[in-house]
């Protein structure tokens, strides 16, 4: 036999928990930001194969001159423009990275605007350093990047998704 006080206590406890869960859900929704997609009109009509960073590095020879879509962490600094694997369990050295060759022949604009990726906008430049990005471009094995320190280059970058 249940006591009447027990049922009332559970009802009082459920209301605050429900409100707390609702508040947590609303907070998580507000933290979600929209992806920014910068596109170029280069390579329209090309088919891009989506591939994981590890799969590309394991079979790089198979992707020479192939159009791919790949995700990783972009790193830039003086003399550095590289895409590295964003996995915690991978080697992020230059020998396991791609040189990223952005070309003026393929200007990248924020979808639906004429705002360029590398243009000064809203008081600053778009920050992509140390961010996870998705890139589309063509893999070129003969180009090993600055001082030939990289496995290959992704050229003709026609999409950057932040």
Where are these regions (language model features)?
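Sec-dependent bacterial lipoprotein signal peptides
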Residues: 2-29
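OB-fold and OB-like single-stranded nucleic-acid-recognition modules
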Residues: 31-162
């Amino acid at each position: 036999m249940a006591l009447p006080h027990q049922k009332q206590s559970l009802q009082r406890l459920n209301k605050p928990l429900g409100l707390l869960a609702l508040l947590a859900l609303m907070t998580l929704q507000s933290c979600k930001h929209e992806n920014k997609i910068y596109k170029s009109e280069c390579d329209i009509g090309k088919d891009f194969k989506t591939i994981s960073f590890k799969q590309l590095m394991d079979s790089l020879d198979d992707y020479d001159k192939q159009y791919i879509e790949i995700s990783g962490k972009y790193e830039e600094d003086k003399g550095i423009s590289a895409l590295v694997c964003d996995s915690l369990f991978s080697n992020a050295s230059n020998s396991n990275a791609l040189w990223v060759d952005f070309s003026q022949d393929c200007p990248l604009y924020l979808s639906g605007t004429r705002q360029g990726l590398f243009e000064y906008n809203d008081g600053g430049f778009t920050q992509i350093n140390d961010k996870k990005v998705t890139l589309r471009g063509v893999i070129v094995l003969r180009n090993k990047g600055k001082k030939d320190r990289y496995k290959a280059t992704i050229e003709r970058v026609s999409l950057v998704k932040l």
